[in-house]
Each structure stands twice: as structure tokens, then as C-alpha cells.
Amino acid sequence: MPHEELPSLQRPRYGSIVDDERLSAEEMDERRRQNIAYEYLCHLEEAKRWMEVCLVEELPPTTELEEGLRNGVYLAKLAKFFAPKMVSEKKIYDVEQTRYKKSGLHFRHTDNTVQWLRAMESIGLPKIFYPETTDVYDRKNIPRMIYCIHALSLYLFKLGIAPQIQDLLGKVDFTEEEISNMRKELEKYGIQMPSFSKIGGILANELSVDEAALHAAVIAINEAVEKGIAEQTVVTLRNPNAVLTLVDDNLAPEYQKELWDAKKKKEENARLKNSCISEEERDAYEELLTQAEIQGNINKVNRQAAVDHINAVIPEGDPENTLLALKKPEAQLPAVYPFAAAMYQNELFNLQKQNTMNYLAHEELLIAVEMLSAVALLNQALESNDLVSVQNQLRSPAIGLNNLDKAYVERYANTLLSVKLEVLSQGQDNLSWNEIQNCIDMVNAQIQEENDRVVAVGYINEAIDEGNPLRTLETLLLPTANISDVDPAHAQHYQDVLYHAKSQKLGDSESVSKVLWLDEIQQAVDDANVDKDRAKQWVTLVVDVNQCLEGKKSSDILSVLKSSTSNANDIIPECADKYYDALVKAKELKSERVSSDGSWLKLNLHKKYDYYYNTDSKESSWVTPESCLYKESWLTGKEIEDIIEEVTVGYIRENIWSASEELLLRFQATSSGPILREEFEARKSFLHEQEENVVKIQAFWKGYKQRKEYMHRRQTFIDNTDSIVKIQSWFRMATARKSYLSRLQYFRDHNNEIVKIQSLLRANKARDDYKTLVGSENPPLTVIRKFVYLLDQSDLDFQEELEVARLREEVVTKIRANQQLEKDLNLMDIKIGLLVKNRITLEDVISHSKKLNKKKGGEMEILNNTDNQGIKSLSKERRKTLETYQQLFYLLQTNPLYLAKLIFQMPQNKSTKFMDTVIFTLYNYASNQREEYLLLKLFKTALEEEIKSKVDQVQDIVTGNPTVIKMVVSFNRGARGQNTLRQLLAPVVKEIIDDKSLIINTNPVEVYKAWVNQLETQTGEASKLPYDVTTEQALTYPEVKNKLEASIENLRRVTDKVLNSIISSLDLLPYGLRYIAKVLKNSIHEKFPDATEDELLKIVGNLLYYRYMNPAIVAPDGFDIIDMTAGGQINSDQRRNLGSVAKVLQHAASNKLFEGENEHLSSMNNYLSETYQEFRKYFKEACNVPEPEEKFNMDKYTDLVTVSKPVIYISIEEIISTHSLLLEHQDAIAPEKNDLLSELLGSLGEVPTVESFLGEGAVDPNDPNKANTLSQLSKTEISLVLTSKYDIEDGEAIDSRSLMIKTKKLIIDVIRNQPGNTLTEILETPATAQQEVDHATDMVSRAMIDSRTPEEMKHSQSMIEDAQLPLEQKKRKIQRNLRTLEQTGHVSSENKYQDILNEIAKDIRNQRIYRKLRKAELAKLQQTLNALNKKAAFYEEQINYYDTYIKTCLDNLKRKNTRRSIKLDGKGEPKGAKRAKPVKYTAAKLHEKGVLLDIDDLQTNQFKNVTFDIIATEDVGIFDVRSKFLGVEMEKVQLNIQDLLQMQYEGVAVMKMFDKVKVNVNLLIYLLNKKFYGK
């Protein structure tokens, strides 16, 4: 290592800033910076050493580590170590760092860091520790990354995945130069050093269920460890609040010792650290063991105990016990498989024997079990003949095979299949690792041999092309070619035959390859060898026969011919003399014709090759010899064969009849036939007469022979019993093997068909089971067990739940932000309008503009910083208050009657604000199915209440402005219904606006005036027509009529388009709006049963069209139906066109005809009637919707079975406001004392203030702007996890529904691990040890999942405790619960508790529906969020537009010196500027000007005694007004010109000053402008 550890703990290199020596402030600061640099170097060294242990790889030196980690390669390798399923080596970019070393960082290196972050997310490390990608890649905050690595090490230690990181502070030494360089680096980037010592505490808080309970439990454990009593320590470890798993009472002494050592070591390190850390920076967990450290040490002890147990059971030789020991989760070993138990036992036993200590350490077991499990899976795949699985297992790095080339995996698999069959036939079950490795090596050798052979084939083809026989022979004799039977003496003939074969292949147009392959070369060599043998045979025949003839050895001719001819059977011995005579005669004739004779014989083979043989020298050749003279006196082979054949044929023909001489004699003897027939008949008659005796004789004889033969056979068997048994066993084995291989081959040949059949059968079985689950009234337990896994909450479920919660929060926040932004923009619009009237208010406009641009921030920080005193602090009192508020809002949310009554108790203006803020917030703006369902229930209850109490006649709904209807329309036209309105109306509205030629004006007077103006424009002369006319007069002009008719035609055409868009888009209408329309129709009909359907449908139309759609058509820009740019607007013609269409549709929806002043439009009345009929069908169909319970699949028990608890995001101001209103109207909405609401309000007490809600200290008491700060903080939003106080109680007071839920969860846990046909059978049958182990493993897996589960999704504490029970205890608890439920009538033992099984089946079905609805909700929320973002972007564009306008005003103002300059800091004119003089008026003068109207209790003639001094203050637009009576100053008030302008805008004409002086607001503003601004 680059830095040596010091022998013992000592102070850091640069000591503490509180050393005894006297240091100046600068020296102390320098010392502190040096200490920070040293500590950080120690943390770097700690991270480096820990990563080296995990990666088994050396990292760069400590001082270079930061730079070495920037490319993310080591981080990605670390991710592969703890999350191998997430990160593989192939996914790591530049894994060998060759590119990085060559050309430095590349942007793709960030992929490595991203993979590391995702891997940490997958194992559940809290995100509070994560660095940003740029922190690493751009080196913006490397200490943050090192901080994260430390947190990760502690978290992995808790999970038992990695060792604990070392504490090296004060144990390593760095040079002064290294420390100074690091200090400069830290100062260069200005990085705030994270607090490494607080990682344990932060991690504990982030992962806890209840921070306070966890903290207390951890402290109790530390205290118990300090006392040293092992039994007491185990009791504290068992505390459920500590959230510790796998605590074994039998290991109490080991836990005590390990935790004692760890705690003492941590305390020792803490003492060193605290010497250089200020008191404020110290953390409680610096000396205490954190929950993660405790769990890590428990895991460490458990692991060692499990390893000891494994080593103890291996020598016993029981595979089942060994398997159980290996499967224990405490052993932290890879998965093992029961079918390979014998293999684990044998292999581990052998490994243990090979070990010198006869003991296998955990690391050895880890590697061995991983490899053996991989081998087991490979054997399983081989047995199932699954080639794909075999190949996947071979590719697995866990199996650890050497020299495995992934390119040949398929070949390895096929070979292993063959070897597997062979070992199976020999009675061996599994292939061992060594056998698999040997098979891999064998295949590699074969592949290498084949590759070498391919090279040799290439050499042979090249030699053939060269035409050199010796070169060809040399290549044929290469060992790698493996060509057999090559005779070097016939090299030339090999060359000729090979060349000929290759020429033929070249000439074959269908041949793909133009070279000879190995089998073709071997065939050519074999053909050449056949030619060679034939030639030798021919030479032997010719030489032997001719030499025999020349030697006149007639007696040898037969032996010569038989030994020399190809078929000796054709030689007939009787013809020997004839053969000799014929051959001698032929040779003599041939010799007479020869004058000179040579010594060479020639043979032509296949009419292609010539073979030469010298009879004298015995040499042979495949090429023509030099000076070749043929031996023409000798008979050739063909001549000899022809002579032999001729002699043989003649002999056969000559003797054909002699062979049948005896037969001919017999035929001659048949002349005595009659005599023979008489003898035959006599014999036959005798036998017939003696038939009975003959039969007996024959039977006796046959029996005798059969018995004799049987006894002889039997004796043979007895004498050879051993041999017979062997023969029989081998025969049976061969038969069975043949049958098995035949069947196996059949399966291989029909693999695809078999897979399809199996898939079909499985699918049919699964389909039938699911139909049974869904359709059967009493689904059997066996079916339920198959689908119970669907109730598990996967990581995907949690991710989707978190995503839904995040989107809900974002949607709610965005809606509120947009609403506030819209209000501020409207106010800004007003202020700019007022600015035009009075320039002095520009400062206020600028101030409001800054408010628009100011981003919200700081509130949550203040809230979080007051955790010790605020509503979310850890004190018991605050916790109780928070829980009570959560229960209060849950009650309000789920019981709509309270809010329905409260709405009608408040004044109209106050209830509207309450609805727009608190109610919609309480229901999260219906951002999910549950809250939409509950909000609709509120709307329904409130609407029914309003109709019941406030509607006296049917038309009141139309003519009035019902509160609930207004609320429903406002909600559905907001964020949730905005997309609907856009989809429904945007296309046709945009078409109308974009049609520049479209002019719709149905006002005859306006049409007339436009026509007159057009005439004057065209002629340039004043028209003689009157300008002011009535409607009747205007209609007398044909031109006006024509234009009016054209407008009416355009109106009808355009209205049709809008109507069709509305009618065809019924499904786009929000379900909530349609349901309220249905409730409205039914409620009106219930109160007014005599109302006709037309009246009811008109009321529905008033809601759906007039209130919901009509405003959006008239003002599409105001309802965000179309996109408008800032500064852009709809012109008057476009707005008139839209208004005309809306007017026609409004008349049609209410079936109102054009009459009276609209008589000129009466031609459209038929059109209105037809349109009404279409609207009537539309309104009727719109009310045809299911009830919310059916639509959303909700009931009153839904909250008890859903995964996540409901969460709302509400401001402190809204909580206080709601609390206040509930107390104010408590007597009206909850008159009973024992009402649930009254009980909760009683628990809360008085309404808290904002400051008490946040906690004392949230705001500085001396802050002059304390009121404004508190007002701003009151808008801080907090999240409330809603819970019901009355759903689940502790102990025995649990209600039957909650008991049913708990019992179902316990039953699900039991039936997973214990088989059985009925619930009763399972509960009465004891669980086996294996089932207990499987159950414990499942519960550990669930605990790990629960540890990553967000707070709002966790189960109750009682359910967590139940889940930790062993299998048998769970069964006993189920039996107790079932007896309780049977007493309440929920279940019955007579049907074996089928009722609770039916409930579980229902939960399974509902879970699928819930997942489907959740996906739909995700899409819906995303769509809503996109629309809100677009709207926010539009508002931002308006803000920019206003900013530009204000900037222009400022620029203009600077150029005008005649007016008073305005300072943006609010201080008025610069120093030295002349201030306006005070203005003094008597009351009589002001009364004369009309400014002053009256003074209470003072007569007009006394006005002269009253004077008013108006003085401009330092602040722009602020005036002091002093009143004097008879020269004595009475009172003083302050006037704000902005307030006056606001009152003027709101239409307030008269205001009071001094509570008694009435003044005219408009004239007062005029006076101030004139006197102070020169206006």
C-alpha cells in the first residue's frame, strides 16, 4: 500500500484547532483546513481498501483515486459485485480502460456511473446519499461520491453482502505535500465536506418505519451490549421496532461478544475523531452502533454459525441434512437444489477431506456451492434435453469452466447430452464438474483437430493445382490431414485421380465450392488404391499364366488361374486340361506373329490411366517409361480372361443334360405307375384302419422326444445359471436402452410439436384453473394456491405505486401553482392597466413582477429545520397531533356528509374559496381512482342535500347558480377536464378562428352600418342613407337581407360542425360530469315526480352544454382550448363568430326558438328543433353510466386491502382554516357528542397558530417582517398519510373485518409452503423441517422487500410481527382466528372454511383489476401533467411578455425628466432631488371642488375651520394627510395611491378617511395627480 498504517491510534497529522499552543486566527483556520484535507484523505484510503477487497483488484494510489474513479469503470465493477443481475461485464464501457488511457475521458464513460447509481437504487440504498453524474464525471463534487461509497459499504454490510469498511482516521500517514495538494483541490472547487460520521444515523432514519421507535430500540441495544449480559442483549435485539432479522437466541453469547468488540472499536475511533471535531458537528451515532451495523454483525455471527453447522453435518454423510444446512439463509450461500443433494454431499465431503484442517471456510463454501449449483442446473437441463438451457448454463460464469469458447456452446451441449446418456446407462445420475470439464477439453481438441484438418485440406488442394506428385504425396501424408491408406509408391496416380476429381468439380455448375473437401480427397485416394490393387492383380495373372505356359507346366495351370483371377469360383477344376490347351494354342498363334519382343506390359484403367510393368526388372510406373518395348508375345489379361470364359461356357453347355441322368431314369420307371399306386392305396388303407394306434404311437414318440429335449435344456440352464442371469440382464438393458433412445430420438425429431403440445396443455390447464378461480362460487384450495403469487407486491408494483404517488403530488402541486399563477397574472393585468392611468404605480407593478418570477423556496427547509418542535417532530405529543390530523382528514375524505353540511353552512363567497382550495386539495384533485370515487360521493351527497333543501321548483337549477353545480363544472373544466374540452372543441373552434373569410353577423343594424361604411369607402362620398336605423328599417334593404341570409347559412354550416364534434365525442366527456348529470336528473325527478322527461333533459343540457361547454366556445382563449401566444388575442370578428355559434347551440340545447327581437332569425327555428332532438338523445345517453362502486371497483373496505396508504398534500394555512371552520360549525355538522368528528376535534383542542404548527424558533421573534414571513410559511405544503382511527385496533379489540384480513394473510403464507387439498387438512398436518426452512426463506425475502418499501406502503406493525412467526405458530394462530370468525358468522367449519378461501380468491381477482386500473391511472396522470406543463409554459410566456412591457416602461421613464424619477429600491428620488411641496386645503375648498362630500357630526358652515395638509412621503405613492380643527392638529392618516387606484378599478366611488370624512375617490386621485405629478 502507498501509505503505511501507524502502529496505534493517534491524533491526525495536523492536530486540532484547540491545541494548547497559542495560535492566531489565521493559523487556526489554516490548521482546520489541513485537518479537513487529512480526514478526507483517510476517507479516500478507507474507500480504496474496501473497494479493493470487493473487486479483488488493485486501485490507483489514494492521491490519484479521485481521478481514477471519474471514468466510472471501478464504480460499474463495484455495481457488478453487489448487483450482478443489474450490471454485467459486457455493459461496462471501456472495461479495460484502454480508451481512457489512450485518449482520456469520453462522454460514454458516464454510462458506467449511471449503472452504478441504478444498481444502488435496485438494492434500496436511500437516494439521499447519491451523487449527481456530473459530480463524478466533471469532478464537481468528488467528496460526495466518496461519501456515497461509505454509505453503500455500511448498507451492504447490513445486508451481509460485503465486509465492513475500515476506520483509518489517525492510522495512515500522508506527506505534508499530499495534504497541502488535497487542501488546495478542495478549496479550488469550493466543496462543502459531507459529514462522514453521520452516515449511520442518516441511514438508520432513512430506512426506518418509525424514526423515534427505531432510535429508542437502537439505544436500548447499545445499552444492553454495554452491560454485557447476553440474554438481555438478545431481548433488545428481538424488539420489533429495531427491525432486525434472523436473531437466534442460541447465539446470544456470540452476538454479545461481536457487538461488544464492534462497539468498543467504534468508541475508540470516535474519541480520536472528536478531538478535532467541534461539539456541534458531533453525531449521536458516532459512538453508538447503528441499526445497519447491528444487523451486519448479527449476519456475521449467523454466517459463522451456519458455516460451522455445515462443516459438522458434511461428515455425517446424510445428503438431506447437508442440503438443509446449505439452504439456511444465515449461511449467505447461493441457491441449492434438492435434486442434487447427493452431489453436494459427495463433492463437499471430498473437498473437506482435501483440506488440511478438515474445515471449509465461508469463502470456500461460497465458491464450491456456486459451482455445484451451476453443475446441478446443467445436469437438470441435460436430463430434460433442453439444449437452450444447457447452453445458457454453460455460459454462466458461476460454473467456472476453463477453456470454454462461447462460439462452440451448442457443440459442447450436444456432446454433453451424449455423455449424459452414456452415464445414465451405466447407472450414474449426474455428471461431475471434472467430467464436464473433460468433455469441454475433448470437444476443444476435436475442434482444434478439425481446424488443423481444414488447413491441411487447403495445402492438398494447392499441391493438386501445382501438379507435383511428390508435393501432393507430402500433403497427403500430413498427420493433421488424417488421410488413410496412402502408398508413397503410387504418388503419380494419386495426383492424376485427385486432379481429375477436382476438374470435374470445377466443371459442375451446381457445385458451391471449387475445392476438394476432406471426404472427397479420401474417396479419390481410395479409388486410386482400388486401381492399384486391380493393376497388381492384372500383372499377377498375366505373368503367372504366361510363365506357366512357357514352362509347359500343365499341372499348375489350375492353381495359377485360381490364385490370379478376381473370381476363383468361376474356375472349374474339370476344365483344367481344356484351359491349358486353349491357352497354349492362343500363345503359340500370338508368338508366331511377333518378330521382336520387349519386356513391358501395359494396362489401361477406366480409359484414363495407363499402368506399366516390366517383367524383367519387376518395376512399375503410371507414366510411359523411356524406351518402352512391349512384350507382345505374351497373352494379355483380357485375352486370358476371354479364353477362360469361352472354355467354361462350352463345358457347362456340354454337361447340362448329364447332370439330370438319374431323374430321367426315374421318369422311365413310371411306366410301372399302376403297381405303385396299388401299393400306396394299400398302405394308406392300413394306416387308416390303425389310425387310433398310429396316433398314440406318434403322440408317445413326440412326447418322449419333447421331454428329453426339455430336460436336456433345463439341465443346461441349471449348469449355466450365472451366465444366463447376465445374458438376461444385458438383454433387458439393451432392450430398455433401445426403447429409451428410440423414444428420446422421437422426441428430438418432434421437439417443436412437443413444445407446442406442452404449451397448449399448460395453457389449457392454466385457463381452466383461472376460469375456476373466476367463475366458481367455491374455488378449491389447489387452484387458489396456483394464483396466490399474484397477491405479492413486486418491485414493479412498488415502483408504480411510487410513480403514481409522485405524479399525484406533482399534479396537485402544479394545479395549485397554476391557479396561483393565474390569479397573479390577472392581478398583474389589472396593475398594468392602472399603470396606464397613473405612472407612479410602476414601482408596485415591478414589485408584483418580481413576485411572479420569484421561485418558491425556503419554506420546506424551515419546516425541516424545526423537526424538533414542529408538527413532524419526533416528540410523542407532536406525533399524536399529526396522527390526529391525519385521522381527521381521513374521516372528512371518506364520510362526505360532514363536508356537504359544512359547504352549506358557510356564506357563498367563503364556501367557493373553501371548495377551490381545501376540498380539491383534500381529494388530491381526484388524481387517482380512489380519490375520484370519494370526490364523486361528496358531489353526489352535496348535490342531493342542496336540491333537497334549496331548490323549490325545477327551473331554480337553471336560473340560479347552485353551489355544487358550480363546483362540479369548475372541477371538470380544470386540469382534469381540460384535455377533454381541447379534444372535443379545439379542432372546430380553431377552424372557425382560422377561417379569415368567415363572417357571421346576425344583427341587421350592424350589417346595415357595415354596408353603409363600405359604400362610403368605395365612392369616397358621404352616403345619403341614414346612419341610425332600427332593425325593421335595416331589413327593408335587399343588400342587408342578402348578407344576413349568407351569415345564417354560414352559421348553420359551422354550427353543424361543432354539433357533430360534440355528439360524436360522448365517450370523451369526463365520467364524473356524466355521473353528476345522472344524479342531478334522478334527484330532480325524485323531488318533482311530475316533471316531464323533456324538463329533466333540459336541466341536464343546462349542465353539460350551457355551463360546461358554452363558455369554452365563446372564450376559447380563456379556457385554454386553443394555444395563444403572449400578446396574441382573438379579434372581434372571430369572437362574434364563436358567440353566434354558441348562441344557436344554447337555444337548441334548451329547445328555445328565435322570437321577439330575434324574429329575423326565425328561419332557423326548424333547424333548432332538429338540433334539440339530437341534443336530447345525447343528454339521455350521457346519463347512462354505471355507479362509481362498479366503475372504480371500490367499496368501504378498499382501503384495508390496498398496498399504499392515501396521501394528501395540503398547506398549513388550509389545515388551520379547515380546523377553524369545523370548530365554528361543529354544532351543525356533528351535533352528537359521541360523533367521530367531535371526538377527533376534542383531541386536537384549540386551533393552532402557524408559528405553533411549525414549532417555536421557525421565525426570529425580532424579525420586523415576522407577520409576512409567517404568512409566507403558512402556504408551506406538507404531506399527510391518511389513516383511520377506527379500522384496526391493537390487542383483542380488533374488529372482525381486520381479523379477516390478518387471517387471510396468514393463510396465504401457510398454503405457499405446505401442500394439502383443504385448509383443514393443512392446519391439522404438522409441517416438515423442509417446509419450515422454505417458509423462513420466504419470510426473509419478504423482510428484505419490506425494508425497501416506502413508509406509506408498509404494513401495520402487528402484521409485520405475524409474518415473522414460524409456520406451526402461524397455523395455530389461524385456528384461533377462524374460531373467532366462526363465532361472528363470517366462516364455517362445516364447509372447511371455504368462505375465507372465497375471500382470498376475490382478492386475487381484484388485485389484477387494481393493477390494470393503476396503469390506466399512470397514463391519465401523465397526460394531465403534460397539459398542466403546457399551461404553465403559457403563463411563463405571459410573464416574459409583461416583463418586456415593464422594461419598456422603465426605459421610457428614464427619458422623461419632467416627471419624478422612480427608484426600484423604493426609496424615491435620489439625494438632492427637490421634493414636492405640501398642499394645504380647507374642508370648505375641498367640498367646493367635490373632493370632500361630508364630515360626520359637523355642519357644512363649519368646514372652513377644518384644514387638511397633504404631504408626499419618502416612499413613492404614499401621502400623509393631517387634519386640523381651528389650527389644532387632530389626526393623521396615510394614503396609498395604489389602494386608491384599486378602489377605482373595483368601482368604489366614495371612501372614508379618519372614520368620519367621506371623499370622492375619483376626484381625490385627480387632485393628487394634478398637484404632485403635473397631470
UniProtKB/Swiss-Prot annotation:
CDD domains: CH_IQGAP2. Residues 933-1182 form the Ras-GAP domain. The keyword Mitochondrion does not apply. Keywords: Calmodulin-binding, Phosphoprotein, Repeat. Residues 41-156 form the Calponin-homology (CH) domain. Isoform 2 expression is enhanced in testis. Binds to activated CDC42 and RAC1 but does not seem to stimulate their GTPase activity. Associates with calmodulin. This is Ras GTPase-activating-like protein IQGAP2. It comes from Homo sapiens (Human).
